[in-house]
């Protein structure tokens, strides 16, 4: 059982637990120990469970009768509870404190069942098409909480950017929202079952922005859970053409929405999602499943469609199809994913997914202008591919 924030030190032969690191920042006190509590402390650093610690100490102290044994057990548990108050040791639990009246809201996205427990006013209306009446047995429960825990979790930094810092410890992932005004942190348990969004105190004028921040913070969590289910989100705009989803992927400002508008005007194809699409890898094919996140386009869908292909757009003065090698198809597709890349294992998952997609769908690059001719060119290429 790992211990955090404290070190055992002797001051003039008297044992103390002295805080360090985050413990100092959280202003947690030093703790005076006696001989028994020193032995408990030593046992905590050796054994993995409460039961093992109690069993070891009972064997060490050898109580004379059952009453002494019970008294010793109670003393041990009381001392360990005292240590737990100061977040000193890892007891493999995930604490949730929600200090206000909450609303339970069940919703399903791409087959993942979720339960929101928090302020109803912070639950985005963008989730409306995904609401469910089934609250029991959610895969993940998402709480909102007014204040951060007094004792702040720390861990190994996986990602640090201007927007977000992601840390990991044995129990949880910690998302520190560097640029958000109201949502400050998000904690996700390592077993993927519990998530807590911590926000500042809110006034009436704050709720609109806070709701947006909660909506996008839940996206971070969903991306992680989806990847665990072999589902990956790609930055792209999508259309429905001949009963399949066709994705146009490019960086922001390259012309995804312009191109889907050309298709709509020329071929009357509806747009599925204006900015993000979820690719679900099955045993035999790839599906595009609806998600509520769609950038600023306001266009999303909750339905599922088979994937036809991915067209990688690049602005160019002349409309032209640029053939890609198999390796380029895989690499460029993976680079358009926004699924987590916090670890090399996550990168490998993304790479495997892109490899599968390249074998089961059309992937090509379109060098394009903003004229109708670009849509006509790739339309002909898609029809040619479908005839193969």
Regions found by a protein language model. Name each.
Residues 5, 9-24, 37, 64, ...:
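A noncatalytic interaction/capping subdomain that flanks phosphate/NTP-handling catalytic cores
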Residues 43-52:
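Short capping segments at the starts of secondary-structure elements
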């Amino acid at each position: 059982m790992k211990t955090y924030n404290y070190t055992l030190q002797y001051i003039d032969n008297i044992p103390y637990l002295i805080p360090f690191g985050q413990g100092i920042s959280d202003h947690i006190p030093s703790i005076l120990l006696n001989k028994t509590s020193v032995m408990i402390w030593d046992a905590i650093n050796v054994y993995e469970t409460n039961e093992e610690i109690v069993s070891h100490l009972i064997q060490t102290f050898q109580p004379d009768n059952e009453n002494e044994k019970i008294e010793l057990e109670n003393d041990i548990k009381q001392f360990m509870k005292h240590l737990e108050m100061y977040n000193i040791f890892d007891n493999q639990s995930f604490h949730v404190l929600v200090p206000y009246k909450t609303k339970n809201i069940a919703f399903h996205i791409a087959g993942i069942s979720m339960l929101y427990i928090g302020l109803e006013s912070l639950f985005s209306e963008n989730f409306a098409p995904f609401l469910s009446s089934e609250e029991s047995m959610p895969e993940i429960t998402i709480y909102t909480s007014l204040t951060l825990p007094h004792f702040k979790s720390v861990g190994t930094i996986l990602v640090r950017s201007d927007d977000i810092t992601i840390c990991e410890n044995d129990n949880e992932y910690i998302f520190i929202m560097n640029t958000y005004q109201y949502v400050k942190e998000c904690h996700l348990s390592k077993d993927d079952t519990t998530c807590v969004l911590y926000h500042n105190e809110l006034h009436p004028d704050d709720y609109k922005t806070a709701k947006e921040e909660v909506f996008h913070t839940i996206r971070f969590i969903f991306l992680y859970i989806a990847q665990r289910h072999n589902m990956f989100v790609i930055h792209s705009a999508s259309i429905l053409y001949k009963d399949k989803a066709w994705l146009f992927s490019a960086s922001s400002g390259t012309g995804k929405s312009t191109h889907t508008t050309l298709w709509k005007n020329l071929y009357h194809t509806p747009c599925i999602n204006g900015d993000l699409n979820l690719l679900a890898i099955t045993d035999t094919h790839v599906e595009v499943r609806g998600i509520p996140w769609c950038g600023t386009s306001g266009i999303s869908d909750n339905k599922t469609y088979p994937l036809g292909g991915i067209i990688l757009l690049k602005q160019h003065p002349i409309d032209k199809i640029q053939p890609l090698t198999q390796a380029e198809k895989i690499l460029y597709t993976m680079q358009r994913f926004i699924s987590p890349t916090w670890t090399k294992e996550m990168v490998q998952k993304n790479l495997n997914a892109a490899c599968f997609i390249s074998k089961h769908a059309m992937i090509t690059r379109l060098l394009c202008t903003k004229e109708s001719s670009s849509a006509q060119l790739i339309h002909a290429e898609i029809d040619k591919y479908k005839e193969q």
